[in-house]
Amino acid sequence: METKILDGLKISKKIIKKIKKKIEKRKKKRKKIPGLAMIVIGNNPASLIYVNKKREACNQAGFFSIYWHLSNQIEEIELINLIKKLNKNKCIDGILIQLPLPIKINYLKIITSIDPKKDVDGFHPYNLGSLCQNNPQFRSCTSKGVITLLKKYKINIHGLYAVIIGSSNIVGKPMYMELLLAGCTVTIVNKNTKNIKTYVKKADLVVIAIGQPNFLYGHWIKLGAIVIDIGINYLYNKNKYKIVGDVHFKSTSVKTSYITPVPGGVGPMTVVSLLENTLQACIM
């Protein structure tokens, strides 16, 4: 069957252009420009790439951004103190902590130290809890990006049976709520689930985010299913790195109605969702 590629890169560029026009209007009216603070700890190659893409997007949209690249040796209290200063800084509308964090740093302590009004990543318990009530201040960027991408391609998911592979706080759980609110019947599975394949074979919509390259093959997929690949993995081959998703694209794409590529699918939509949230924080 003919498969349509969900081109997140193309859609994100269009959204950034619209955001840029809004920023230009704000500048003409001498209104405040959105400000985003980004913090990355250590030298994880993937984290550095993600942050650079976010910085680049800020520049394209006309945002003010500031960047901290901190050592792995930083103490938890030092990071919390930096966040507290940024909470008080009126030039900063959004605070982003690039994940993952070093093992010695408590993720929940860091996230809850961010002012919920500046939690543009949508990970604060306040915002995640509000999402359950369909009234979040900020929606988590990746799951928001997925929903936006589906809407831009006019894909109606209401009434579909959706399976999410991966139950992380960052992607799986927010994605579960987004799909539930969109009218899907949702099952979430993880590494502890037995016979994952049996759930996936019944799914109209599959979302995967587990960080395992080529985990999902085409023979798992129901003919005509929609597949959203959120995984980003770096494989070293022939003296260079290749980016692949959690889905084996070649075998899966021949069975799907819609599929996201990696790279160029969900990643750019995550970045543009961050810009939308930061602009919203500025306007609030």
UniProtKB/Swiss-Prot annotation:
Checking InterPro entries in the record gives: Aminoacid_DH-like_N_sf, NAD(P)-bd_dom_sf, THF_DH/CycHdrlase, THF_DH/CycHdrlase_cat_dom, THF_DH/CycHdrlase_CS, THF_DH/CycHdrlase_NAD-bd_dom
Q: How does it assemble?
A: Homodimer.
Q: Which reactions fall under this protein's catalytic activity? A: (6R)-5,10-methylene-5,6,7,8-tetrahydrofolate + NADP(+) = (6R)-5,10-methenyltetrahydrofolate + NADPH; (6R)-5,10-methenyltetrahydrofolate + H2O = (6R)-10-formyltetrahydrofolate + H(+)
Pfam families (alphabetical): THF_DHG_CYH, THF_DHG_CYH_C
Q: What protein name is recorded for this chain?
A: Bifunctional protein FolD
Q: What's an example of a GO molecular-function annotation for this chain? A: methenyltetrahydrofolate cyclohydrolase activity
Kindly give the Gene3D superfamilies that the UniProt entry links to this protein.
Answer: Leucine Dehydrogenase, chain A, domain 1, NAD(P)-binding Rossmann-like Domain
What does the protein in this record do?
Catalyzes the oxidation of 5,10-methylenetetrahydrofolate to 5,10-methenyltetrahydrofolate and then the hydrolysis of 5,10-methenyltetrahydrofolate to 10-formyltetrahydrofolate.
Q: In which pathway does it act?
A: One-carbon metabolism; tetrahydrofolate interconversion
- Look up the domain of life of the source: Bacteria
Q: Where does NADP(+) bind?
A: 166-168, 232
Assigned EC number: 1.5.1.5, 3.5.4.9
Record keywords: Amino-acid biosynthesis, Histidine biosynthesis, Hydrolase, Methionine biosynthesis, Multifunctional enzyme, NADP, One-carbon metabolism, Oxidoreductase, Purine biosynthesis
Give the similarity note: Belongs to the tetrahydrofolate dehydrogenase/cyclohydrolase family.
Q: What GO cellular-component annotations does this UniProt entry give? A: cytosol
Annotated GO biological process: L-histidine biosynthetic process; methionine biosynthetic process; purine nucleotide biosynthetic process; tetrahydrofolate interconversion
